[in-house]
């Protein structure tokens, strides 16, 4: 989820900011960003909307670059 962290920081948002926008706890968001919790498709869509992106632009690019 390095791409997510990079995008979040580039937009000057904190873990707390993201948690509030997503209506989840800060700890839950931290777990998502750090790969400790599985990311549902619905949550990926919600996160992508915050940055006006498609989920693939944030999450799929990491896997694509590893191939």
Give the label of every model feature segment.
Residues 7-12, 42, 49, 57-67:
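Short, charged recognition helix plus adjacent turn
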């Amino acid at each position: 989820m390095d791409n997510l962290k990079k995008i979040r920081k580039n937009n000057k948002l904190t873990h707390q900011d993201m948690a509030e926008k997503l209506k989840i706890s800060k700890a839950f968001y931290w777990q998502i960003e750090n790969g400790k919790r599985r990311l549902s498709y619905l949550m990926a869509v919600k996160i992508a909307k915050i940055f006006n992106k498609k989920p693939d632009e944030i999450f799929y690019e990491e896997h694509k670059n590893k191939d």
